């Protein structure tokens, strides 16, 4: 069963299904037509979503191209998120960029790329990631500490900081290839799925259902690989 699941998870038709899902979601919502401050934010977001999906799929298959794509899409996502109201985007996305670049560097030096089990380093990084996420978002939402968080931005701050913390935890732990890093992406996609159900964004619900399923499958497969192809001492 695990071998069959690995074949399905790493198949090209899953790549195609993922790209079609995220692009279809954006087009179905008409999001690709969005223009803010003269910038084609909708187009940037739609293209970025498709490229990001391929990056996720490559990372799922333990291919280093996924990390390289993550570096590029971090820049695109920072621009899109900033113009959509994330006031801390240019503070937080460089962390994701550095995390993806570090993963690319570390993975390029690993021949086997076998996932590992949890250790103390994993939890230390996760704790630091959440502290950094809340700190950077606080700086961003207070205009670099020039004022308090506006009342209308308070809920946005908490949601953004929490999601950023989960993202940092997943990204900064990816270089060491912990199988359970996918748990962070599972939680992240569950939150995004719930958020879009509340807002009634049916198309985005389909998008995050796919990401959620991919995270579960990747988690199972990485643990399967870890157990069948143990790390060399």
Segments (PLM) and residue ranges:
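Polytopic alpha-helical membrane-helix bundles and their juxtamembrane interface segments
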Residues: 2-61, 98-100, 106-233
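Long, highly hydrophobic alpha-helical transmembrane signal-anchor segments
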Residues: 50-78
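Short glycine/serine/threonine-biased micro-segments
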Residues: 68, 83, 198
């Amino acid at each position: 069963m695990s071998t069959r699941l690995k074949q399905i998870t790493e198949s090209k038709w899953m790549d195609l299904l993922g790209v079609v899902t995220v692009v279809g979601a954006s087009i179905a919502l008409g999001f690709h037509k969005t223009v803010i401050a003269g910038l084609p934010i909708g187009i940037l977001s739609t293209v970025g979503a498709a490229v990001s999906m391929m990056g996720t799929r490559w990372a799922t298959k333990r291919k280093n191209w996924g990390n390289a794509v993550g570096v590029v899409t971090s820049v695109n996502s920072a621009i899109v998120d900033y113009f959509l109201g994330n006031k801390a985007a240019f503070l937080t996305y460089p962390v994701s960029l550095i995390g993806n670049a570090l993963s690319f560097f570390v993975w390029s030096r690993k021949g086997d790329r076998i996932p590992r089990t949890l250790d103390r380093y994993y939890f230390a990084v996760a704790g630091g990631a959440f502290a950094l996420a809340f700190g950077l978002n606080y700086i961003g939402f207070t205009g670099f500490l020039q004022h308090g968080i506006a009342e209308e931005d308070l809920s946005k701050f908490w949601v953004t900081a929490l999601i950023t913390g989960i993202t940092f935890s997943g990204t900064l732990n990816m270089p060491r290839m912990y199988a359970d890093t996918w748990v962070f992406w599972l939680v992240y996609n569950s939150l995004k799925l719930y958020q879009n159900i509340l807002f009634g964004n049916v198309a985005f619900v389909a998008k995050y259902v796919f990401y959620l399923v991919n995270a579960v499958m990747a988690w199972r497969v990485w643990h399967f690989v870890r157990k069948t192809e143990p790390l060399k001492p």
